[in-house]
Swiss-Prot record:
<protein>
    <recommendedName>
        <fullName>Large ribosomal subunit protein bL20</fullName>
    </recommendedName>
</protein>
<dbReference type="GO" id="GO:0000027">
    <property type="term" value="P:ribosomal large subunit assembly"/>
</dbReference>
<keyword id="KW-0699">rRNA-binding</keyword>
<keyword id="KW-0689">Ribosomal protein</keyword>
<dbReference type="GO" id="GO:0003735">
    <property type="term" value="F:structural constituent of ribosome"/>
</dbReference>
<comment type="similarity">
    <text>Belongs to the bacterial ribosomal protein bL20 family.</text>
</comment>
<dbReference type="InterPro" id="IPR049946">
    <property type="entry name" value="RIBOSOMAL_L20_CS"/>
</dbReference>
<dbReference type="InterPro" id="IPR035566">
    <property type="entry name" value="Ribosomal_protein_bL20_C"/>
</dbReference>
<keyword id="KW-0694">RNA-binding</keyword>
<dbReference type="GO" id="GO:0006412">
    <property type="term" value="P:translation"/>
</dbReference>
<dbReference type="GO" id="GO:0022625">
    <property type="term" value="C:cytosolic large ribosomal subunit"/>
</dbReference>
<dbReference type="GO" id="GO:0019843">
    <property type="term" value="F:rRNA binding"/>
</dbReference>
<dbReference type="Pfam" id="PF00453">
    <property type="entry name" value="Ribosomal_L20"/>
</dbReference>
<comment type="function">
    <text>Binds directly to 23S ribosomal RNA and is necessary for the in vitro assembly process of the 50S ribosomal subunit. It is not involved in the protein synthesizing functions of that subunit.</text>
</comment>
<dbReference type="InterPro" id="IPR005813">
    <property type="entry name" value="Ribosomal_bL20"/>
</dbReference>
<keyword id="KW-0687">Ribonucleoprotein</keyword>
Length: 116
């Protein structure tokens, strides 16, 4: 008996991957093996960078807080130490938002940190 191959399922699987790689450059978009490898590698990059995004944003928030704190005559570390002593539990994301969009509120927070 000849070997039976489910061509419909194979073709559908390949089509699905090639659809996902639309927009890639060169052979990465239309050669099955290259496209499959590129797509799989893209998944690993996505997994890695979902974790890296968290540290990148934290670094950005710290830079923004530091810049705004120095305008008020304080360093970042002194500001964070003062906030801890004053018992103000406010995260870096909110502090960075205050520094960028609400400078008056940020000045009030810095004043409390200086007083502590």
């Amino acid at each position: 008996m000849p070997r039976s191959v489910n061509h419909v399922a194979s073709k559908a699987r390949r089509k699905k991957i090639l659809k996902l790689t639309r927009g890639y450059f060169g052979a990465r978009k239309n050669v099955w093996t290259v496209a499959k490898n590129t797509w799989e590698k893209g998944l690993t990059y996505a997994f890695r960078d979902r974790r890296n995004k968290k540290r990148n944003f934290r670094a950005l928030w710290i830079q923004r807080i530091n810049a705004a704190a120095r305008l008020e005559g304080m360093s970042y570390s002194k500001l964070m130490g003062g906030l801890h002593k004053a018992g103000i539990e406010i995260n870096r994301k909110v502090l960075a938002d205050l520094a960028m969009n609400h400078p008056e509120a940020f000045k009030a927070v810095v004043a409390k940190a200086k007083a502590a």
